[in-house]
From Swiss-Prot:
Keyword Cytoplasm part of the UniProt annotation: yes
GO cellular component: cytoplasm; microtubule
Pfam families in UniProt: Tubulin (PF00091), Tubulin_C (PF03953)
Protein name per the record: Tubulin beta chain
Primary localization: cytoplasm
Source organism per UniProt: Schizophyllum commune (Split gill fungus)
Keywords: Cytoplasm, Cytoskeleton, GTP-binding, Magnesium, Metal-binding, Microtubule, Nucleotide-binding
Binding site for Mg(2+): 69
Cofactor needs: Mg(2+)
Annotated function: Tubulin is the major constituent of microtubules, a cylinder consisting of laterally associated linear protofilaments composed of alpha- and beta-tubulin heterodimers. Microtubules grow by the addition of GTP-tubulin dimers to the microtubule end, where a stabilizing cap forms. Below the cap, tubulin dimers are in GDP-bound state, owing to GTPase activity of alpha-tubulin.
Subunit structure, interactors included: Dimer of alpha and beta chains. A typical microtubule is a hollow water-filled tube with an outer diameter of 25 nm and an inner diameter of 15 nM. Alpha-beta heterodimers associate head-to-tail to form protofilaments running lengthwise along the microtubule wall with the beta-tubulin subunit facing the microtubule plus end conferring a structural polarity. Microtubules usually have 13 protofilaments but different protofilament numbers can be found in some organisms and specialized cells.
Binding residues annotated for GTP, in chain numbering: 11, 69, 138, 142-144, 204, 226
Transmembrane residue ranges: none
């Protein structure tokens, strides 16, 4: 079967990852001790994508937990699923990266990376036909960002033909953890553009807004935010974990969503989102789901899709949904909002369906959009980066770990190129394509 090896790095990555495994284990009927207690055969049909079967009815996640300090991993170990993971798959240092990307990427992280790669190899060898890796991390810190991107490039070297898919928490404009976030994020994006195949952008501020506005939580905790992220992760991977047709593996997903290799940063969304108290008072319909899914308030990255155009979209419906109705609704959205979809990629909106709905819902949908509006997110980080970098603020933290200013300049220009590329395809029209071809013919004559 097509297995996926899951890595979680840094504090953020480990917390999101732990939540993800809670949700997935619950959906597959796997208890905290790894024993299968489910009722539905479909739960086991493609269980090997994420789990190793090690005995009669006992399953262990293909997860590798990495951090440069023991704290977060201790809390995962003492959490509800602590006994589920393989003890050898906890790889941690003692020093911490102190939110310093250079420490994660060049000094502290580089010392630990071989130990992690050994575990990666062991997991990869235990698979039948590995389809790829997924990694959860944040881009604003030291370990998840610095060491996370180091791991990605090392794994890329060793498994060049396997998919690399990242769930990346991007620093948000208003909620900031550390002052050097723009540096760490820019250096990370510089790596992700080159080494990742699919990056799902998640952003704390957008998650806060959803918790606050839609879920009516007055003081959202990180637990609530991570719960939202785990919905999306579970939804994105549904088509990989349960029998289904479309986007049934990471590569097919990428082929459908990535028109140009560098533009692989997706916005994610989930519906239905309702306040906890009012869930049982409404029946969700496909039109409602489709409406909410395309709603800007539903995006888990702080950029507004109405400011750009969708290059491609994938929607994964779950539950007992009529595919005919889904197709009609999706077509409906495209017809009404045709200005927001590029017209030079025909059939750029795809929908897939899986019978098993998430716990507590009759039907749900997960949204993935490759929108040119994601440039807002990079532009914002880039502006903050430039403001600090032109004063060379805080640079000594990085240079004393052996980094060069040149690397900052490179990362900055790579990110600006990325923004420009998104803008170029946002402005592109079918006519331009035609004009371009005519010019080529004239040149040849």
């Amino acid at each position: 079967m097509r297995e996926i090896v899951h890595l979680q790095t840094g504090q953020c990555g480990n917390q999101i990852g732990a939540k993800f495994w809670e949700v997935v284990s619950d959906e597959h009927g796997i208890e905290a001790d790894g024993l299968y207690k489910g009722t539905n055969d479909q739960q086991l049909e493609r269980i090997s994508v994420y789990y190793n079967e090690i005995g009669a009815n006992k399953y262990v996640p293909r997860a590798i937990l990495v951090d440069l300090e023991p704290g977060t991993m201790d809390s995962v170990r003492s959490g509800p699923l602590g006994g589920l993971f393989r003890p050898d798959n906890f790889v941690f240092g003692q020093s911490g990266a102190g939110n310093n990307w250079a420490k994660g990427h060049y000094t502290e992280g580089a010392e630990l990376v071989d130990a992690v790669l050994d575990v990666v190899r062991k997991e990869a060898e235990g698979t039948d036909c590995l389809q790829g890796f997924q990694i959860t991390h944040s881009l604003g810190g030291g370990t998840g960002a610095g060491m996370g991107t180091l791991l990605i490039s090392k794994i890329r070297e060793e498994y060049p033909d396997r998919m690399m898919c990242t769930f990346s928490v991007v620093p948000s404009p208003k909620v900031s953890d550390t002052v050097v976030e723009p540096y760490n994020a820019t250096l990370s994006v510089h790596q992700l553009v080159e080494n990742s195949d699919e990056t799902f952008c998640i952003d704390n501020e957008a998650l806060y807004d959803i918790c606050f506005r839609t879920l009516k939580l007055s003081t959202p905790t990180y637990g609530d935010l991570n719960h939202l992220v785990s919905f999306v992760m579970s939804g994105i991977t549904t088509s990989l974990r349960f029998p289904g047709q479309l986007n049934s593996d990471l590569r097919k997903l990428a082929v459908n969503l990535v028109p140009f290799p560098r533009l692989h940063f997706f916005m994610t969304g989930f519906a239905p989102l309702t306040a906890r108290g009012s869930q049982q008072y409404r029946a969700v319909t496909v039109p409602e789901l489709t409406q909410q899914m395309f709603d800007a308030k539903n995006m888990m990255a702080a950029s507004d899709p109405r400011h750009g155009r969708y290059l491609t979209v994938a929607a994964m419906f779950r539950g007992k949904v009529s595919m005919k109705e889904v197709e009609e609704q999706m077509q409906n959205v495209q017809n009404k909002n045709s200005a927001y979809f590029v017209e030079w990629i025909p059939n750029n909106v795809l929908a897939s369906q899986c019978d098993i709905a998430p716990r507590g819902l009759r039907m749900s949908v997960t949204f993935l959009g490759n929108s040119t509006a994601i440039q807002e997110l990079f532009k914002r980080v880039s502006d903050q980066f430039t403001a600090m970098f032109k004063r060379k603020a805080f640079l000594h933290w990085y240079t004393q770990e052996g980094m060069d200013e040149m690397e900052f300049t490179e990362a900055e220009s790579n990110m600006q190129d990325l923004v420009a590329e998104y803008q170029q395809y946002q402005d592109a029209t079918v006519e331009e394509e035609g004009e371009y071809e005519e010019e080529v013919i004239e040149d040849q004559e």
